[in-house]
UniProtKB/Swiss-Prot annotation:
Membrane topology note: Peripheral membrane protein
Cofactor binding summary note: Binds 2 iron ions per subunit.
One Pfam family of this chain: COQ7
GO molecular function term, any single one: metal ion binding
Lineage, broadest ranks: Bacteria, Pseudomonadati, Pseudomonadota, Gammaproteobacteria, Lysobacterales
UniProt xrefs under CDD domains: DMQH (cd01042)
Family the UniProt entry places it in: Belongs to the COQ7 family.
Species, as recorded: Xanthomonas axonopodis pv. citri (strain 306)
Name of the protein in question: 3-demethoxyubiquinol 3-hydroxylase
């Protein structure tokens, strides 16, 4: 990726180029993880065709979740008013990049692919993140908390429904769940505002739609 000098990041064009590069890397690239894959030392097993398709569908949902998280965090960081909030968001986004890479690796192992709608998921999440950020950093952090809590819930569901023998996927999801819980706790400590009741419900409905589509496509 082309590096842009920090002294030039005040230019609107430079900021636009950075955001465009982040979007391309997330949606079409394969950003490398900074941490080792949690499944690296877990033996793989041969799943039957039905188990493999189910595991791939769940891991595709998780991959989409990480694409959405990247879009949300980058959208929020782009309009964050406080440098500490921006740093918090970008730091969380880096850990989500690890998750993105691990899920992509597992999809490849399962002879599957990411969602065809990743550009749509990213664009929608980026717009939501930017809108939340424009309301203020406390709102932005509130969206982080709610997003991570909902992700934790669906990771628990996936850990319950994955084929019992698919320990490689389980190893990845367990570490992801720990990270998501920490992101939510850190956002709360940083001053997150609790979101009004209709917003979490709308987010859950959108998440349900995403999961239904991403499981197959």
């Amino acid at each position: 990726m082309t590096q842009i000098s920090p002294t030039r990041l005040h230019s609107p064009l430079d900021r636009l180029l950075v955001e465009a590069q982040r979007a391309l890397d997330t949606v079409f690239g394969n950003p490398p993880a900074e941490r080792p894959n949690p499944a690296a030392d877990t033996p793989d097993v041969v799943l039957d065709p039905e188990q493999r398709l189910h595991a791939a569908g769940l891991m595709r949902i998780n991959h989409v979740g990480e694409v959405c998280a990247q879009g949300l965090y980058f959208g929020q960081a782009a309009v964050a008013r406080d440098a500490h909030t921006r740093h918090h968001l970008l730091e969380a986004a880096q850990e989500e990049t690890d998750h993105l890479a691990w899920c992509a690796d597992r999809l490849h192992e399962l002879d599957s692919r990411p969602s065809l709608f990743n550009p749509v998921w990213y664009a929608g999440s980026y717009a939501l993140g930017a809108l939340a950020g424009l309301r203020g950093d406390d709102w932005s952090l509130g969206f982080v908390v709610e997003t991570e809590r909902q992700v934790e819930a669906h990771l628990d569901e996936h850990l319950e429904t994955l084929p019992q023998s698919d320990q490689r996927s389980r190893a990845i999801l367990r570490v992801m769940k720990i990270d998501e819980a920490r992101h939510a706790d850190q956002a709360e400590q940083a001053g997150a505002r609790p979101l009004p009741a209709p917003i979490p419900s709308a987010m859950a409905l959108a998440s349900k739609l995403m999961k239904t589509v991403a499981y197959r496509l």
